[in-house]
């Protein structure tokens, strides 16, 4: 599943319960911290961008290759395989979300901030669900849904949604002189 657009996912494994007994709070904290870190930094390994994830010890995820940088060894060594990827379906799925992001941008421009915020949350949830369904399918990381997610991430649509969310919220909360 590598291409010139690929990135390297660096998973930092933490025992959330050793940080705080409220593991949902710990997860929310680490999710926010990693999103901020990923937004601010552009670290690469051989020109592939590194994306940080923080996961709870024992958390399961599917991957064709897992390498421990701590132990300098493969945990799951990737096997090169010929995989048929449905790029046409992935492009269609991603284009639908590109179109939705543009409509949301128009809502923000038109001052319809509350409506924009509701749409943003729904679209982000649908994107998460789409990827989850894809990763849990037989095709897993090669599914059209996961490839569509990667297209959206590569094309900065996920960032655009987050930026629109901040813009809509800030505009909604701003008090203007009359």
Predicted regions, residues:
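Catalytic core of pol beta-like nucleotidyltransferases
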Residues: 1-6, 13-178
């Amino acid at each position: 599943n590598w291409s010139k657009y690929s990135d390297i996912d660096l998973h930092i494994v933490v025992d959330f319960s050793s940080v705080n007994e409220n593991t949902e709070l710990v997860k929310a904290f680490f999710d926010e911290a990693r999103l901020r870190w990923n937004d601010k930094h552009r670290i690469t390994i051989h020109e592939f961008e590194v994306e940080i994830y923080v996961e709870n010890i024992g958390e399961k995820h599917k991957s064709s290759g897992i390498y421990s940088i701590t132990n300098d060894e493969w945990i799951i060594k990737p096997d090169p395989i010929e995989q048929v990827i449905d790029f046409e379906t992935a492009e269609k799925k991603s284009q639908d979300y590109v179109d939705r992001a543009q409509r949301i941008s128009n809502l923000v421009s038109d001052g319809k901030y509350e409506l924009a915020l509701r749409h943003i949350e729904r679209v982000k949830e649908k994107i998460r669900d789409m990827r989850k369904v894809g990763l849990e399918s037989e095709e897993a990381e090669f599914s059209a849904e996961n490839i569509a997610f990667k297209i959206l991430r590569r094309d900065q649509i996920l960032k655009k949604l987050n930026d629109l969310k901040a813009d809509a919220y800030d505009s909604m909360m701003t008090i203007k002189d009359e």
